[in-house]
Amino acid sequence: MNGFSDLNPSESKPSLSQLAPLEAILFDVDGTLCDSDPIHLIAFQELLQEIGFNNGVPIDEKFFVENIAGKHNSEIALLLFPDDVSRGLKFCDEKEALYRKIVAEKIKPLDGLIKLTKWIEDRGLKRAAVTNAPKENAELMISKLGLTDFFQAVILGSECEFPKPHPGPYLKALEVLNVSKEHTLVFEDSISGIKAGVAAGMPVIGLTTGNPASLLMQAKPAFLIENYADPKLWAVLEELDNKS
């Protein structure tokens, strides 16, 4: 979204040395691999305005961040259509179709992501995508970013008993990859996602692509970065290299 950058000033030199030797890295998809939240917002604004939601006034970024970002469509349907959830789910399907149409032309990786994927591959670390996004969205974004062969597993919230913020999707990723939470790192950009990773027992690095740092810190990430080119991240990875 805006690339919120009011990063927590007290965290000047974070360390994740307790993860050494690192076994795996888990990534959310929306807002974590790419800055896709602005496209979700456009799709929601367009379709909600068509049906006269909020008296025809487009929802703003604040409403989106506080009520929609990072949430599963079942939650969003209930929020937008509390008296007719089946209509809400149908609306969400229509919104996802519009999103896929727009995102296919606009998607690009966050700064530093390709460098990080090479770092991960060079060290033979296991990796998975863990997302609340619908399957079609996740597959499209991962494919358009050129990461289909990079990820060894894609865990969908809809295929778990509960989606994020429940820890289930991240626990399933650990099981599928056969790695331990004590040696696995998570990247997330939403409160819902950070809560899920933390509840699963792993340190989570939060990205401020779509949410203010002050909001993300409530979910207790290890620390925050603006993107994968952030020197703070590479200092942590270098320390992990030296400890392994």
Swiss-Prot record:
Ubiquitous with highest expression in flowers. This is Haloacid dehalogenase-like hydrolase domain-containing protein Sgpp. SUPFAM superfamilies: HAD-like. The active site is at residues 28, 30. It comes from Arabidopsis thaliana. Its cofactor is Mg(2+). Its EC number is 3.1.3.-. Induction: Induced by NaCl and sorbitol. Keywords: Hydrolase, Magnesium, Metal-binding. One of its GO terms (molecular function) is sugar-phosphatase activity. Belongs to the HAD-like hydrolase superfamily. DOG/GPP family. It comes from the Eukaryota. Optimum pH is 7.0. Gene3D superfamilies: HAD superfamily/HAD-like, Putative phosphatase, domain 2. Mg(2+) binds at residues 28, 30, 189. Acts as a phosphosugar phosphatase on a broad range of sugar phosphate substrates with preferential activity on D-ribose-5-phosphate, 2-deoxy-D-ribose-5-phosphate, 2-deoxy-D-glucose-6-phosphate, and D-mannose-6-phosphate and with a lower activity on D-fructose-1-phosphate, D-glucose-6-phosphate, DL-glycerol-3-phosphate, and D-fructose-6-phosphate. One of its GO terms (cellular component) is plasma membrane. NCBIfam families: HAD-SF-IA-v3.
